[in-house]
């Protein structure tokens, strides 16, 4: 059974010829929304294929024209729907890169002491660097930046993340 992963959301029609405004939630919007790309929307628990005919950047959004969506009425029918990519259409990532789904819920350890700090519970992408929320077994969650001086090793095969905490990143109280 194919798995699907969210890569954006269709917000509203744009113009009269079937174009829609898309908020991309992927790290690879140019790749995911490229001409000829295969995306999916969910209709009544079924995934329906959409093929990208054309894409252009517009402010912080993308204006996307899908094949067979040729007027505003058809465009309105797909608005407010999430866009998905099939797992089989995901590309291999370069060394040192990973999909969020592969690292979420991984145990996080102190690289120096080996102490388990918690699990990676959430990832936010506010700007230049992602930030990761670490949930310890007891106590409050804390956030760390995904930068080289903090995240030392991500071992996908063994589901293990090693970090060096900078002073002040973790509230011990």
UniProtKB/Swiss-Prot annotation:
<keyword id="KW-0143">Chaperone</keyword>
<keyword id="KW-0698">rRNA processing</keyword>
<dbReference type="InterPro" id="IPR002676">
    <property type="entry name" value="RimM_N"/>
</dbReference>
<dbReference type="InterPro" id="IPR009000">
    <property type="entry name" value="Transl_B-barrel_sf"/>
</dbReference>
<keyword id="KW-0690">Ribosome biogenesis</keyword>
<keyword id="KW-0963">Cytoplasm</keyword>
<dbReference type="GO" id="GO:0043022">
    <property type="term" value="F:ribosome binding"/>
</dbReference>
<dbReference type="InterPro" id="IPR056792">
    <property type="entry name" value="PRC_RimM"/>
</dbReference>
<dbReference type="GO" id="GO:0005840">
    <property type="term" value="C:ribosome"/>
</dbReference>
<dbReference type="GO" id="GO:0042274">
    <property type="term" value="P:ribosomal small subunit biogenesis"/>
</dbReference>
<comment type="function">
    <text>An accessory protein needed during the final step in the assembly of 30S ribosomal subunit, possibly for assembly of the head region. Essential for efficient processing of 16S rRNA. May be needed both before and after RbfA during the maturation of 16S rRNA. It has affinity for free ribosomal 30S subunits but not for 70S ribosomes.</text>
</comment>
<dbReference type="InterPro" id="IPR011961">
    <property type="entry name" value="RimM"/>
</dbReference>
<comment type="subunit">
    <text>Binds ribosomal protein uS19.</text>
</comment>
<dbReference type="GO" id="GO:0006364">
    <property type="term" value="P:rRNA processing"/>
</dbReference>
<dbReference type="GO" id="GO:0005737">
    <property type="term" value="C:cytoplasm"/>
</dbReference>
<comment type="similarity">
    <text>Belongs to the RimM family.</text>
</comment>
<dbReference type="Pfam" id="PF24986">
    <property type="entry name" value="PRC_RimM"/>
</dbReference>
<dbReference type="Pfam" id="PF01782">
    <property type="entry name" value="RimM"/>
</dbReference>
<dbReference type="InterPro" id="IPR036976">
    <property type="entry name" value="RimM_N_sf"/>
</dbReference>
<protein>
    <recommendedName>
        <fullName>Ribosome maturation factor RimM</fullName>
    </recommendedName>
</protein>
<feature type="domain" description="PRC barrel">
    <location>
        <begin position="95"/>
        <end position="169"/>
    </location>
</feature>
<dbReference type="InterPro" id="IPR011033">
    <property type="entry name" value="PRC_barrel-like_sf"/>
</dbReference>
């Amino acid at each position: 059974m194919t798995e699907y992963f969210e890569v954006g959301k269709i917000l509203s029609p744009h113009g009269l010829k079937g174009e829609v405004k898309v908020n991309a939630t992927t790290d690879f919007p140019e790749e995911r929304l490229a001409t000829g790309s295969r995306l999916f929307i969910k209709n009544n628990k079924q995934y329906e294929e959409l093929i990208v005919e054309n894409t252009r950047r517009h402010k912080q959004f993308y204006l996307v024209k899908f094949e067979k969506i040729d007027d505003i009425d058809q465009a309105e029918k797909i608005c407010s729907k999430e866009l998905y990519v099939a797992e089989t259409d995901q590309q291999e990532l370069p060394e040192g890169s990973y999909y969020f789904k592969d690292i979420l819920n991984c145990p996080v350890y102190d690289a120096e002491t080996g102490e388990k700090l918690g699990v990676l519970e959430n990832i936010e992408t506010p700007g230049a660097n992602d930030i990761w929320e670490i949930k310890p077994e007891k106590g409050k969650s804390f956030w760390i930046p995904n930068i080289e001086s903090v995240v030392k090793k991500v071992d996908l095969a063994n589901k293990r993340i090693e970090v060096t905490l900078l002073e002040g990143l973790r509230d011990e109280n």
